[in-house]
Amino acid sequence: MDMRQVNSLSYEEFVETFGNVVERCPVVAAAVWSGRPFANSHDLEASIGEFIDSLPVAGQEGIVRCHPDLAGRDLKRGALTAESRGEQTQAGLTLLDAGDAARMNRLNAQYKERFGFPFVICARMNNKEEILLRLAERLGNEPAQERQCAIEEVKKICQLRLQDIIQCPATHTKL
């Protein structure tokens, strides 16, 4: 899909197309639709980021809570969104051995107990070892710092999901 097509989508089509660029949060797509026309994918991405940043703390935490636990119950039940399943598969989280799975479950539980929302990281930019390391490290963050970190990871996920949907025009260079 190119930007001309993006900008011509009806409200319903836009929300259907972009409703999961922020995991299980179609309200984000619904909110930014009225900002059309977008000059390019970066403009759309910036609009989404600005909307998320403008939310009160409870709204930002709500967005983070829409994400599943990594390698968690939803993965085992087959209840992940297609995007999340692909991202977790790419990071190697669907093939954890028993030891790594137990460690992931333990750290996820500790994290959720400490912060009140699931650990979010852009799985496509990390592998299972890096994810386990970051999860353990981020347990030491202060709550406000960790909420901001989680929101920045949500934005990275959003950026990659937008790239999956929108064709970016090729860069033409003179040789």
From Swiss-Prot:
Official protein name in the record: 2-oxo-4-hydroxy-4-carboxy-5-ureidoimidazoline decarboxylase
Similarity annotation: Belongs to the OHCU decarboxylase family.
Assigned EC number: 4.1.1.97
Top EC class of this enzyme: lyase
Assembly notes: Homodimer.
Motif Microbody targeting signal, chain ranges: 173-175
Pathway field: Purine metabolism; urate degradation; (S)-allantoin from urate: step 3/3
Physiological role: Catalyzes the stereoselective decarboxylation of 2-oxo-4-hydroxy-4-carboxy-5-ureidoimidazoline (OHCU) to (S)-allantoin.
One cellular component term from this protein's GO annotations in UniProt: peroxisome
Residues the record lists as binding substrate: P68, S84, R85, G86, E87, Q88, F119, V120, I121, C122, A123
SUPFAM superfamilies in the cross-refs: UraD-Like
Keywords: Decarboxylase, Lyase, Peroxisome, Purine metabolism
GO BP of this protein: allantoin metabolic process; purine nucleobase metabolic process; urate catabolic process
Matches recorded under Gene3D superfamilies: Oxo-4-hydroxy-4-carboxy-5-ureidoimidazoline decarboxylase (1.10.3330.10)
A Pfam family matched in the record: OHCU_decarbox
Highest taxon in the source lineage: Eukaryota
Catalytic residues as annotated in Swiss-Prot or TrEMBL: H67
Reactions listed under catalytic activity: 5-hydroxy-2-oxo-4-ureido-2,5-dihydro-1H-imidazole-5-carboxylate + H(+) = (S)-allantoin + CO2
InterPro entries per UniProt: OHCU_decarboxylase (IPR018020), OHCU_decarboxylase-1 (IPR017580), OHCU_decarboxylase_sf (IPR036778)
Keyword Lyase: yes
The keyword Lyase is annotated on this UniProt entry: yes
Gene (UniProt): urad
Compartment(s) of residence: Peroxisome
Molecular function GO terms recorded: 2-oxo-4-hydroxy-4-carboxy-5-ureidoimidazoline decarboxylase activity
